[in-house]
């Protein structure tokens, strides 16, 4: 482990979990009894294998609560009731997922040989939001790669379906562009987004603080060559 140049912590949502299991199913399904019966993606596995052979990188994966092996079952009504219980505790599901990600970071640091290894975090969609908040409270994260991340918690906007998962009272103080600026004070932030203008507040603020190099706005993966 001491030879690794970096470790990338991948925070998985359900789509990410499906990709993970199909990639590694043919090699590790017998070792991990929580793998679903998804078809194996040999092409994806060979791509991962080539990456490991080329770079001294380690990959870690975490499913925050309610995802993958810990996904809750039951009717839609039962799922709604379960989410309401978090509110009774003064929390939301994704608020607690932020804590899960923080604990994953702390657990990686506790592994012998990884205490000082460069740490990246990668996440998509709502897990990108949760990873962003988690990074604000944890030190020693070198880089955040956030894909397809919502730009607001405000569910009353025109495209309300694209709003981020709720966090109690967060909009009293900030929204995601402000949270991104906070995170970029501590770690390099790479956001993959079609609408780069949505992050103008973040980029302008960081420029005014002399930290504009902390933020990169990139095209979504796989769209570079598309018209």
Role assignments for model-derived ranges:
Residues 185-189, 211-212:
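A short helix->loop->beta-strand "cap" motif at the edges of active sites that frequently abuts
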Residues 4-111, 115-118, 151-161:
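Cap/lid segment of the alpha/beta-hydrolase catalytic domain
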């Amino acid at each position: 482990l001491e030879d690794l140049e970096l470790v990338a912590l991948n925070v998985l949502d359900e789509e990410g979990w499906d990709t993970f299991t199909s990639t590694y199913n043919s090699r590790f399904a017998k070792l991990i009894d929580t793998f679903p019966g998804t078809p194996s993606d040999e092409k994806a596995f060979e791509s991962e294998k080539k990456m490991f052979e080329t770079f001294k990188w380690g990959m870690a994966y975490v499913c925050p609560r309610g995802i993958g092996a810990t996904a809750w079952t039951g009717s839609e009504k039962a799922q709604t009731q379960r989410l309401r219980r978090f509110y009774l505790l003064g929390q939301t599901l994704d608020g607690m997922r932020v804590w899960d990600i923080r604990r994953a970071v702390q657990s990686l640091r506790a592994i012998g040989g990884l205490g000082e290894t460069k740490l990246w975090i990668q996440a998509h969609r709502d897990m990108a939001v949760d990873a962003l908040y988690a990074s604000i409270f944890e030190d020693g994260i070198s880089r955040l790669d956030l894909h397809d991340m919502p730009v607001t918690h405000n569910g009353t906007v025109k495209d309300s379906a694209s709003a981020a998962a709720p966090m109690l009272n967060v909009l009293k103080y900030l929204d995601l562009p402000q949270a991104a600026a906070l995170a970029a004070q501590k770690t390099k932030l790479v956001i993959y987004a079609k609408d780069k203008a949505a992050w103008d507040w973040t980029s302008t603020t960081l420029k005014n603080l002399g930290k504009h190099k902390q933020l990169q706005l990139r095209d979504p993966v796989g769209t570079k060559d598309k018209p």
